[in-house]
């Protein structure tokens, strides 16, 4: 590994600190910048694959841009990127390669990692997934009673759930008619109960997604769904109540995304129907691996290939574009600018597409699990803030909920606005094109956040002087606008890859390992220790802290 560089000790960091101090003087800075440069929007608008990205409404000058790019150079971001693409073990704490980019490389490529051709391995699994997807979609794959599959349930959690459900929701217009996917992740029994309540076990296929086939939540839910399906088949008289009949039903109604073939077989799944992935694929980077099997079934192999092509297009851009035209690099550096120099603690992602309603939740795991770290990859403490809280809702819902805070709150909240030019459902309200009305809000919000409203402009509207201050908008609230022609599988792949690489850039600058997630381990271990106390074991209860003892005792007293 290269020597760790402390970003705060670089010349570029000092330059940026000085630029921030000067830039912060005076209100309505973006108004002045646009007035001074009629070509600002054109100069700060970049294209990456099918994405049209307007960065001009950010708190940015050419001098700041150059200093940010110099910071990237001094932190050797491109060298670290190349190491990732080459399969070097940049996941230091787990001594692993980080190769989600290999999941979408061309079949003709080669990439040897730890003695294996990763690209060949990927396409071997993809071919298997596509053959399976075609069988389900065509009706060739049938349940134990001979009926074709109508519902696919994906049982997973974290990256094995958030990515597939987000992508399925985003691409619903591309889903095969008569086929539905549902997703069970929460160990709360309500999740599985509600998701299966109206389903027919005879036409339901279950995908259990767990690399090790040991994830507590996933295996608990998998066993519950197995019991629901088998008991339902028996109750309907579809199968006899024998062990052999139940085993036959599991073999027809369950497949796995896992590499633990012994555990898969023990569950009752034929290992032939297990789709593998690798230690160099992190969960939050795995939607385009076998974890996306449910999506491949839903949108078909061609749709999934287009999805992968979108990822690859942005991978190529990130690898080859000049720094000043490199969109993921630039956006990652802007996030550093706001987090570390503007004291921004959160980042809003505001898709003006209802189909992207799960995209902010997906980005929460991608960004916060990756960069929510207080220790650098060499074990030393970080020297500056890291990570942001990512959040958001689709427009225009958010406008009537939390935009107030973004417009007039006391903290800078950078926001990414995402929209498509062509809707899936063109609709007219009388003579009004509803999508155009919808996107008018998209355009208006970024303008309002950037340019605000002065006290004189408020007074010119005849506003009572007493409430003028409350109706002033300071402006200078930074936004990035991302647009595409339509929300296709390829465009969705591009969006995901864009944010993957943004997250990577930030992690390199902060000197952290963006590809481990030790923060999720402690709570999981403690839950196993506390479980006996919850179930009534007083000795186990006595080992807990007083607060936990009190909470568990209250629960035991009130549980019926």
UniProtKB/Swiss-Prot annotation:
The keyword Isomerase appears for this protein: yes
Coarse class of the protein's main subcellular location: cytoplasm
Catalytic activity: alpha-D-glucose 6-phosphate = beta-D-fructose 6-phosphate
Pathway assignment: Carbohydrate biosynthesis; gluconeogenesis; Carbohydrate degradation; glycolysis; D-glyceraldehyde 3-phosphate and glycerone phosphate from D-glucose: step 2/4
PANTHER family noted in UniProt: GLUCOSE-6-PHOSPHATE ISOMERASE
Transmembrane region(s): none
Annotated SUPFAM superfamilies: SIS domain (SSF53697)
Organism: Cutibacterium acnes (strain DSM 16379 / KPA171202) (Propionibacterium acnes)
GO molecular function: carbohydrate derivative binding; glucose-6-phosphate isomerase activity; monosaccharide binding
Domain of life the protein comes from: Bacteria
E.C. no: 5.3.1.9
Cellular compartment(s): Cytoplasm
GO-annotated biological processes: gluconeogenesis; glucose 6-phosphate metabolic process; glycolytic process
The protein's name in its UniProt record: Glucose-6-phosphate isomerase
Role summary: Catalyzes the reversible isomerization of glucose-6-phosphate to fructose-6-phosphate.
Family recorded in the similarity comment: Belongs to the GPI family.
Catalytic machinery residues: 369 (proton donor), 400, 524
InterPro entries: G6P_Isomerase (IPR001672), G6P_Isomerase_C (IPR023096), Phosphoglucose_isomerase_CS (IPR018189), SIS_dom_sf (IPR046348), SIS_PGI_1 (IPR035476), SIS_PGI_2 (IPR035482)
Catalytic class of the enzyme: isomerase
């Amino acid at each position: 590994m290269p020597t760790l560089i402390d970003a705060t000790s670089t010349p570029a960091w000092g330059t940026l600190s000085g630029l921030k101090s000067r830039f912060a003087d005076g209100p309505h800075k973006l108004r002045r910048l646009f007035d001074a440069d009629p070509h600002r929007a054109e100069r700060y608008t970049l294209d990456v694959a099918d994405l049209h990205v307007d960065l001009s409404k950010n708190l940015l000058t050419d001098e700041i841009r150059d200093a940010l790019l110099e910071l990237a150079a001094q932190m050797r971001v491109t060298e670290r990127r190349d190491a990732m693409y080459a399969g070097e073990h940049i996941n230091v704490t787990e001594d692993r390669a980080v190769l989600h980019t290999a999941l979408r490389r061309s079949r003709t490529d080669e990439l040897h990692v730890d003695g294996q051709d990763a690209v060949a391995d990927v396409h071997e699994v993809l071919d298997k997934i596509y053959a399976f997807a075609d069988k389900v979609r065509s009706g060739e794959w049938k349940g134990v009673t001979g009926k074709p599959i109508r519902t696919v349930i994906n049982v997973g959690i974290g990256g094995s759930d958030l990515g597939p459900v987000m992508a399925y929701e985003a691409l619903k217009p591309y889903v095969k008619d008569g086929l539905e996917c549902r997703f069970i992740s929460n160990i709360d029994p309500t999740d599985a109960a509600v998701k299966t309540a109206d389903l027919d076990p005879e036409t339901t296929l279950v995908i259990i997604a767990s690399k090790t086939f040991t994830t507590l939540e996933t295996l608990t839910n998998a066993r519950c769904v197995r019991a629901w399906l088998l008991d339902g088949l028996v109750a309907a008289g579809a199968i006899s109540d024998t062990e052999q009949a139940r085993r036959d039903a599991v073999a027809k109604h369950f497949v796995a995304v896992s590499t633990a073939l012994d555990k898969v077989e023990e569950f009752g799944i034929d290992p032939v129907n297990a789709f593998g992935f690798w230690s160099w694929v992190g969960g939050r980077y795995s939607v385009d691996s076998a974890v996306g099997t449910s999506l491949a079934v839903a949108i078909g192999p061609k749709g999934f290939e287009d999805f992968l092509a979108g990822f690859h297009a942005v991978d190529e851009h990130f690898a080859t574009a000049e720094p000043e035209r490199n969109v993921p690099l630039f956006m990652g550096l802007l996030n550093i600018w706001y987090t570390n120099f503007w004291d921004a603690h959160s980042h809003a992602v505001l898709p003006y597409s209802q189909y992207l309603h799960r995209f902010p939740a997906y980005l929460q795991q991608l960004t916060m699990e990756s960069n929510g770290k207080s220790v650098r990859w060499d074990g030393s403490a970080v020297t500056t803030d890291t990570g942001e809280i990512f959040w958001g809702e689709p427009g225009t819902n958010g406008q009537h909920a939390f935009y107030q805070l973004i417009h007039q709150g006391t903290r800078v909240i950078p926001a990414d606005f995402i929209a498509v030019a062509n809707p899936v459902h063109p609709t007219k309200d009388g003579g009004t094109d509803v999508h155009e009305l919808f996107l008018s809000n998209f355009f208006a919000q970024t303008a309002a956040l950037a340019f605000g409203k002065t006290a004189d402009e408020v007074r010119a509207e005849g506003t009572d002087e007493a409430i003028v201050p409350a109706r002033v908008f300071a402006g200078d609230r930074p936004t990035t606008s991302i647009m595409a022609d339509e929300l296709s599988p390829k465009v969705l792949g591009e969006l995901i890859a864009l944010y993957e690489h943004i997250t990577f850039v930030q992690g390199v600058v902060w000197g952290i390992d963006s590809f481990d997630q030790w923060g999720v381990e402690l709570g999981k271990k403690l839950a196993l220790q506390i479980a006996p106390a919850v179930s009534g074991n007083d000795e186990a209860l006595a080992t807990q802290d007083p607060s936990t003892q009190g909470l568990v005792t209250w629960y035991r007293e009130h549980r019926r």
